[in-house]
C-alpha cells in the first residue's frame, strides 16, 4: 500500500523522471501534489503498470491533483551537462511550473540538486512507496512516450514506438546500420566495438 504523504500538514510534491537510461530523446520529469485524502487502488510503481493502465491513470491524476507539471530537458542539453544533472534540471523545471508552491519535495532516487528554499527528501524506489512519486512517474513516462511516438514517425527505422529510445538490440542495430539522428544523445552513442560485441 503506497503512502499518501511523508508528513501530513504540509504541501508535499512527488517528483520522478523518465528516459534517463535512453540513447535517444529528451529526459522528462513530473512533479505532482496530491490531496492528503487521495486514494487510487490502481496507482502503483508505473514501471509495473501496463501502458494501457498508465494512460488510464494519467487523466485521473491530472484531474484530482492539487497541482502537477512536466519538465523537459533536450538531448542537446543532456550532452552539455550530463544525464544526472539533466534529470535534476527536468525536475526543477517541473517544480517551478507548479501552480501551488510545495513546502517539501519527495524525490525518487538517492540524489538531488536542492531546489531553492524548498526542503527535500530522496527516496530510493520512491515510486513504489509514495503516491505522489508514483503519480509523477506515470505523468513523466506517458508524456515522454507520447514524445517518442511522435519522433518515431520521423525516424521509423529506430523502432522508437517499441523501445522509446532505450538501448534494445533492435535500436543498437539500427544505430549501427543508419548512424545516429539529431535526437540521439551524442554522449550516449555506443562505440562501434560495443555494437559489434552486442553490449
UniProtKB/Swiss-Prot annotation:
Keywords: Cytoplasm, Endonuclease, Hydrolase, Manganese, Metal-binding, Nuclease. Manganese or magnesium. Binds 1 divalent metal ion per monomer in the absence of substrate. May bind a second metal ion after substrate binding. Its EC number is 3.1.26.4. InterPro entries: RNase_HII, RNase_HII/HIII, RNase_HII/HIII_dom, RNaseH-like_sf, RNaseH_sf. One of its GO terms (molecular function) is manganese ion binding. Its main location: cytoplasm. GO terms for cellular component: cytoplasm; ribonuclease H2 complex. A divalent metal cation binds at residues 16-17, 108. GO terms for biological process: DNA replication, removal of RNA primer; mismatch repair. It catalyses: Endonucleolytic cleavage to 5'-phosphomonoester. Coiled coil: none annotated. It is found in: Cytoplasm. SUPFAM superfamilies: Ribonuclease H-like. Its cofactor is Mn(2+); Mg(2+). Residues 10-199 form the RNase H type-2 domain. It comes from the Bacteria. It holds the Pfam family RNase_HII. Belongs to the RNase HII family. Endonuclease that specifically degrades the RNA of RNA-DNA hybrids. This is Ribonuclease HII. It comes from Parabacteroides distasonis (strain ATCC 8503 / DSM 20701 / CIP 104284 / JCM 5825 / NCTC 11152).
